[in-house]
Amino acid sequence: VTARRAVLKTFALLPLAGCAATPATPTTTPPPATTTTTTSAAPVKHDALVELEKKFDARLGVYAAGVGTIEHRADERFAFCSTFKGLAAAAVLHRNPMTHLDTVVTYTEADLMKSSTITRQHVQTGMKLRDLCDAAVRHSDGTAGNLLLRALGGPAELTRYLRDLGDDETRMDRVEPDITSATPGDPRDTATPRSLGTDYQRLVLGDALEPAKRDFLKDLLERSVTGAKRIRAGVPQGSKVASKTGTGSYGTANDIAVVWPPGREPILIAIMSSRSSADAKYDEALIAEATAYVVKTLI
Protein backbone atom coordinates (compact mmCIF):
# COMPACT_ATOMS: atom_id res chain seq x y z
CA VAL A 1 0.00 0.00 0.00
CA THR A 2 2.86 2.38 0.85
CA ALA A 3 4.51 1.71 -2.51
CA ARG A 4 1.20 2.27 -4.33
CA ARG A 5 0.58 5.59 -2.56
CA ALA A 6 4.11 6.78 -3.27
CA VAL A 7 3.82 6.00 -6.96
CA LEU A 8 0.41 7.58 -7.32
CA LYS A 9 1.58 10.69 -5.46
CA THR A 10 4.48 11.03 -7.91
CA PHE A 11 2.04 11.45 -10.78
CA ALA A 12 -0.66 13.39 -8.97
CA LEU A 13 0.79 16.72 -10.11
CA LEU A 14 1.96 15.61 -13.56
CA PRO A 15 0.46 17.84 -16.28
CA LEU A 16 -1.38 16.10 -19.09
CA ALA A 17 -0.58 18.63 -21.81
CA GLY A 18 0.64 16.76 -24.85
CA CYS A 19 -0.21 13.44 -23.16
CA ALA A 20 -3.92 13.04 -23.82
CA ALA A 21 -5.22 9.58 -24.55
CA THR A 22 -6.39 8.66 -28.03
CA PRO A 23 -9.94 7.36 -28.65
CA ALA A 24 -10.90 3.87 -27.53
CA THR A 25 -11.03 1.01 -30.03
CA PRO A 26 -12.89 -2.32 -30.06
CA THR A 27 -11.19 -5.27 -28.39
CA THR A 28 -11.70 -7.61 -31.33
CA THR A 29 -9.94 -5.62 -34.06
CA PRO A 30 -6.66 -3.71 -34.34
CA PRO A 31 -6.94 0.00 -33.52
CA PRO A 32 -7.90 1.91 -36.67
CA ALA A 33 -5.61 4.68 -37.87
CA THR A 34 -6.82 8.23 -37.39
CA THR A 35 -6.78 9.72 -40.88
CA THR A 36 -7.59 12.76 -42.92
CA THR A 37 -8.33 12.53 -46.62
CA THR A 38 -4.61 12.38 -47.42
CA THR A 39 -2.43 11.66 -44.38
CA SER A 40 -2.57 9.91 -41.01
CA ALA A 41 -2.54 11.98 -37.85
CA ALA A 42 0.72 11.94 -35.92
CA PRO A 43 0.67 9.63 -32.90
CA VAL A 44 0.30 11.27 -29.51
CA LYS A 45 3.66 11.65 -27.77
CA HIS A 46 3.59 10.79 -24.10
CA ASP A 47 6.41 12.88 -22.67
CA ALA A 48 6.04 11.36 -19.21
CA LEU A 49 6.85 7.91 -20.59
CA VAL A 50 9.85 9.28 -22.48
CA GLU A 51 11.09 10.76 -19.21
CA LEU A 52 10.66 7.42 -17.47
CA GLU A 53 12.87 5.80 -20.10
CA LYS A 54 15.56 8.36 -19.33
CA LYS A 55 15.13 8.04 -15.58
CA PHE A 56 15.46 4.23 -15.60
CA ASP A 57 17.80 3.97 -18.61
CA ALA A 58 15.40 1.52 -20.22
CA ARG A 59 13.28 0.94 -23.30
CA LEU A 60 9.62 1.07 -22.34
CA GLY A 61 6.66 -0.24 -24.30
CA VAL A 62 3.11 0.61 -23.25
CA TYR A 63 -0.29 -0.21 -24.65
CA ALA A 64 -3.31 0.67 -22.55
CA ALA A 65 -6.99 0.74 -23.43
CA GLY A 66 -9.98 1.91 -21.44
CA VAL A 67 -12.06 5.00 -22.14
CA GLY A 68 -9.16 5.91 -24.42
CA THR A 69 -5.84 4.42 -25.45
CA ILE A 70 -2.20 5.11 -24.64
CA GLU A 71 0.52 3.91 -26.99
CA HIS A 72 4.27 4.22 -26.50
CA ARG A 73 6.46 1.86 -28.53
CA ALA A 74 3.27 -0.19 -28.68
CA ASP A 75 4.33 -1.96 -31.87
CA GLU A 76 7.97 -2.61 -31.00
CA ARG A 77 9.07 -6.14 -30.14
CA PHE A 78 10.01 -7.19 -26.62
CA ALA A 79 10.80 -10.62 -25.18
CA PHE A 80 7.61 -11.68 -23.43
CA CYS A 81 9.22 -14.14 -20.98
CA SER A 82 6.75 -15.64 -18.48
CA THR A 83 3.76 -13.65 -19.70
CA PHE A 84 3.22 -16.54 -22.14
CA LYS A 85 1.97 -18.72 -19.29
CA GLY A 86 -1.46 -17.12 -19.14
CA LEU A 87 -1.77 -17.61 -22.89
CA ALA A 88 -0.68 -21.24 -22.66
CA ALA A 89 -3.28 -21.89 -19.98
CA ALA A 90 -5.89 -20.21 -22.17
CA ALA A 91 -4.94 -22.42 -25.13
CA VAL A 92 -5.26 -25.57 -23.01
CA LEU A 93 -8.65 -24.37 -21.78
CA HIS A 94 -9.84 -23.48 -25.28
CA ARG A 95 -8.92 -26.82 -26.82
CA ASN A 96 -10.34 -29.09 -24.12
CA PRO A 97 -13.48 -29.53 -21.99
CA MET A 98 -13.22 -28.40 -18.38
CA THR A 99 -13.16 -32.05 -17.27
CA HIS A 100 -9.81 -32.40 -19.05
CA LEU A 101 -8.28 -30.26 -16.30
CA ASP A 102 -8.42 -33.31 -14.04
CA THR A 103 -5.96 -35.17 -16.28
CA VAL A 104 -2.75 -36.00 -14.39
CA VAL A 105 0.49 -35.01 -16.13
CA THR A 106 3.67 -36.81 -15.12
CA TYR A 107 7.23 -35.48 -15.37
CA THR A 108 10.71 -36.14 -14.00
CA GLU A 109 13.50 -34.37 -12.12
CA ALA A 110 15.04 -33.58 -15.51
CA ASP A 111 12.09 -31.28 -16.25
CA LEU A 112 12.75 -29.09 -13.21
CA MET A 113 14.54 -25.75 -13.18
CA LYS A 114 15.28 -22.94 -10.76
CA SER A 115 11.79 -21.49 -11.04
CA SER A 116 10.06 -24.85 -10.43
CA THR A 117 8.82 -23.84 -6.99
CA ILE A 118 5.54 -25.79 -7.16
CA THR A 119 6.24 -28.64 -9.57
CA ARG A 120 9.35 -29.59 -7.57
CA GLN A 121 7.05 -30.73 -4.77
CA HIS A 122 5.09 -33.21 -6.93
CA VAL A 123 7.62 -35.10 -9.06
CA GLN A 124 6.59 -38.46 -7.62
CA THR A 125 2.86 -38.05 -8.19
CA GLY A 126 2.57 -35.71 -11.16
CA MET A 127 0.03 -32.87 -11.23
CA LYS A 128 -3.43 -32.33 -12.64
CA LEU A 129 -3.65 -29.89 -15.54
CA ARG A 130 -5.72 -27.52 -13.41
CA ASP A 131 -2.91 -27.43 -10.84
CA LEU A 132 -0.31 -26.90 -13.56
CA CYS A 133 -2.34 -23.92 -14.77
CA ASP A 134 -2.37 -22.60 -11.21
CA ALA A 135 1.37 -23.11 -10.78
CA ALA A 136 2.20 -21.52 -14.14
CA VAL A 137 -0.12 -18.52 -13.96
CA ARG A 138 -0.16 -17.71 -10.25
CA HIS A 139 3.39 -18.73 -9.29
CA SER A 140 5.12 -18.42 -12.70
CA ASP A 141 6.52 -21.93 -12.25
CA GLY A 142 8.75 -22.59 -15.28
CA THR A 143 8.25 -26.34 -15.43
CA ALA A 144 4.48 -25.91 -15.21
CA GLY A 145 4.61 -23.52 -18.15
CA ASN A 146 6.66 -25.99 -20.17
CA LEU A 147 4.26 -28.81 -19.34
CA LEU A 148 1.34 -26.72 -20.58
CA LEU A 149 3.24 -26.20 -23.84
CA ARG A 150 3.90 -29.94 -24.00
CA ALA A 151 0.19 -30.61 -23.52
CA LEU A 152 -0.52 -28.33 -26.48
CA GLY A 153 2.04 -30.04 -28.71
CA GLY A 154 4.90 -27.55 -28.34
CA PRO A 155 5.61 -23.82 -28.71
CA ALA A 156 4.44 -23.72 -32.33
CA GLU A 157 0.98 -24.82 -31.23
CA LEU A 158 0.71 -21.84 -28.90
CA THR A 159 1.63 -19.57 -31.81
CA ARG A 160 -1.06 -21.29 -33.87
CA TYR A 161 -3.63 -20.64 -31.14
CA LEU A 162 -2.66 -16.97 -31.00
CA ARG A 163 -3.10 -16.66 -34.77
CA ASP A 164 -6.59 -18.10 -34.39
CA LEU A 165 -7.15 -15.53 -31.63
CA GLY A 166 -6.33 -12.77 -34.12
CA ASP A 167 -2.76 -12.08 -32.98
CA ASP A 168 -0.40 -11.96 -35.98
CA GLU A 169 2.61 -10.68 -34.02
CA THR A 170 3.30 -12.79 -30.92
CA ARG A 171 5.45 -15.85 -31.62
CA MET A 172 6.45 -18.71 -29.33
CA ASP A 173 9.59 -20.54 -30.47
CA ARG A 174 11.27 -22.06 -27.42
CA VAL A 175 10.56 -23.13 -23.85
CA GLU A 176 11.76 -22.10 -20.39
CA PRO A 177 14.46 -21.14 -19.53
CA ASP A 178 15.63 -20.28 -23.08
CA ILE A 179 12.87 -17.74 -23.61
CA THR A 180 14.32 -15.54 -20.87
CA SER A 181 17.54 -14.84 -22.83
CA ALA A 182 15.73 -11.80 -24.30
CA THR A 183 18.58 -11.00 -26.71
CA PRO A 184 17.97 -7.64 -28.44
CA GLY A 185 17.08 -8.10 -32.11
CA ASP A 186 16.19 -11.78 -31.72
CA PRO A 187 12.56 -12.12 -32.88
CA ARG A 188 12.06 -15.46 -31.16
CA ASP A 189 9.64 -15.51 -28.25
CA THR A 190 8.64 -11.89 -28.67
CA ALA A 191 5.47 -9.83 -28.79
CA THR A 192 4.49 -6.20 -28.98
CA PRO A 193 2.71 -4.47 -26.10
CA ARG A 194 -0.30 -4.04 -28.37
CA SER A 195 -0.47 -7.69 -29.48
CA LEU A 196 0.13 -9.18 -26.04
CA GLY A 197 -2.19 -6.76 -24.30
CA THR A 198 -4.96 -7.35 -26.82
CA ASP A 199 -4.63 -11.11 -26.30
CA TYR A 200 -5.24 -10.75 -22.57
CA GLN A 201 -8.04 -8.27 -23.20
CA ARG A 202 -9.82 -10.77 -25.45
CA LEU A 203 -9.31 -13.60 -22.98
CA VAL A 204 -10.31 -11.79 -19.79
CA LEU A 205 -12.90 -9.29 -21.03
CA GLY A 206 -13.98 -10.75 -24.36
CA ASP A 207 -15.57 -13.97 -25.53
CA ALA A 208 -12.42 -15.77 -26.72
CA LEU A 209 -13.08 -18.36 -23.99
CA GLU A 210 -16.35 -19.90 -22.86
CA PRO A 211 -17.62 -18.22 -19.65
CA ALA A 212 -16.55 -21.02 -17.28
CA LYS A 213 -13.09 -21.18 -18.83
CA ARG A 214 -12.75 -17.39 -18.82
CA ASP A 215 -13.70 -17.28 -15.15
CA PHE A 216 -11.15 -19.98 -14.33
CA LEU A 217 -8.32 -18.08 -16.05
CA LYS A 218 -9.41 -14.71 -14.64
CA ASP A 219 -9.42 -16.12 -11.12
CA LEU A 220 -5.84 -17.39 -11.52
CA LEU A 221 -4.67 -14.03 -12.84
CA GLU A 222 -6.39 -12.17 -10.01
CA ARG A 223 -4.74 -14.38 -7.39
CA SER A 224 -1.24 -14.15 -8.84
CA VAL A 225 1.49 -14.05 -6.19
CA THR A 226 3.92 -12.21 -8.49
CA GLY A 227 3.97 -8.55 -9.49
CA ALA A 228 3.13 -6.79 -6.23
CA LYS A 229 5.61 -4.02 -7.11
CA ARG A 230 4.65 -3.68 -10.77
CA ILE A 231 1.20 -2.76 -12.13
CA ARG A 232 -0.43 -3.59 -8.80
CA ALA A 233 1.73 -0.92 -7.12
CA GLY A 234 0.60 1.80 -9.53
CA VAL A 235 -3.18 1.43 -9.47
CA PRO A 236 -5.64 3.14 -7.11
CA GLN A 237 -6.19 1.45 -3.77
CA GLY A 238 -9.12 -0.94 -3.92
CA SER A 239 -8.58 -1.84 -7.58
CA LYS A 240 -9.04 -5.42 -8.72
CA VAL A 241 -6.14 -6.64 -10.87
CA ALA A 242 -5.79 -9.73 -13.07
CA SER A 243 -2.15 -9.86 -14.18
CA LYS A 244 0.77 -11.90 -15.45
CA THR A 245 4.41 -10.89 -15.13
CA GLY A 246 7.51 -11.80 -17.09
CA THR A 247 11.21 -11.32 -16.32
CA GLY A 248 14.42 -12.04 -18.22
CA SER A 249 17.94 -10.99 -19.15
CA TYR A 250 18.76 -7.50 -20.45
CA GLY A 251 16.75 -6.03 -17.59
CA THR A 252 13.53 -7.38 -19.08
CA ALA A 253 10.49 -6.76 -16.89
CA ASN A 254 6.92 -7.06 -18.13
CA ASP A 255 3.45 -7.00 -16.68
CA ILE A 256 0.16 -7.46 -18.52
CA ALA A 257 -3.03 -6.74 -16.61
CA VAL A 258 -6.70 -6.00 -16.71
CA VAL A 259 -7.46 -3.49 -13.95
CA TRP A 260 -10.84 -2.65 -12.45
CA PRO A 261 -10.44 0.69 -10.60
CA PRO A 262 -13.15 1.29 -7.97
CA GLY A 263 -16.33 2.49 -9.66
CA ARG A 264 -14.73 2.55 -13.11
CA GLU A 265 -14.75 0.50 -16.28
CA PRO A 266 -11.83 -1.95 -16.68
CA ILE A 267 -8.53 -0.86 -18.20
CA LEU A 268 -6.15 -3.07 -20.14
CA ILE A 269 -2.51 -2.22 -19.32
CA ALA A 270 0.38 -3.91 -21.11
CA ILE A 271 3.85 -2.76 -20.08
CA MET A 272 7.07 -4.28 -21.42
CA SER A 273 10.62 -3.07 -20.79
CA SER A 274 14.26 -3.92 -21.39
CA ARG A 275 17.76 -2.53 -21.00
CA SER A 276 20.87 -2.60 -23.17
CA SER A 277 23.24 -5.03 -21.41
CA ALA A 278 22.72 -8.74 -20.74
CA ASP A 279 23.40 -8.47 -17.01
CA ALA A 280 21.40 -5.28 -16.50
CA LYS A 281 19.06 -5.33 -13.51
CA TYR A 282 15.39 -4.57 -13.96
CA ASP A 283 13.59 -2.04 -11.79
CA GLU A 284 9.96 -2.78 -11.00
CA ALA A 285 9.42 0.88 -10.12
CA LEU A 286 9.55 1.64 -13.86
CA ILE A 287 6.41 -0.42 -14.40
CA ALA A 288 4.70 0.96 -11.30
CA GLU A 289 5.35 4.57 -12.33
CA ALA A 290 4.28 3.93 -15.93
CA THR A 291 1.08 2.39 -14.57
CA ALA A 292 0.39 5.42 -12.40
CA TYR A 293 0.69 7.65 -15.48
CA VAL A 294 -1.64 5.41 -17.47
CA VAL A 295 -4.25 5.38 -14.72
CA LYS A 296 -4.04 9.14 -14.21
CA THR A 297 -4.51 9.69 -17.94
CA LEU A 298 -7.33 7.24 -18.58
CA ILE A 299 -9.45 7.72 -15.46
Question: Predicted segment positions?
Answer:
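Structured C-terminal helix/loop/strand segments within mature extracytoplasmic catalytic/sensor domains
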Residues: T2-P15, A20-T36, A41-V50, A151, ...
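A short, well-structured edge-of-sheet supersecondary motif
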Residues: P43-A74, T103, V259, I269
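Short glycine/serine- and small hydrophobic-enriched flexible loop segments
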Residues: A90-M98, R150, T198-L205, A292-K296
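Active-site SXXK
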Residues: F78-Y107, I269
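Active-site-proximal beta-strand/loop segments in catalytic clefts of secreted hydrolases
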Residues: A65-G66, V137-S140, A151-L152, V175, ...
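Mid-domain, small-residue-enriched loop/turn segments at the edges of structured enzyme/sensor domains
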Residues: R59-L60, L149-L205
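Conserved catalytic neighborhood of penicillin-recognizing serine enzymes
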Residues: L112-L148, P155
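Acidic helix-start/capping segments at beta-turn-to-alpha-helix junctions
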Residues: T103-I118, L152-G153, I179
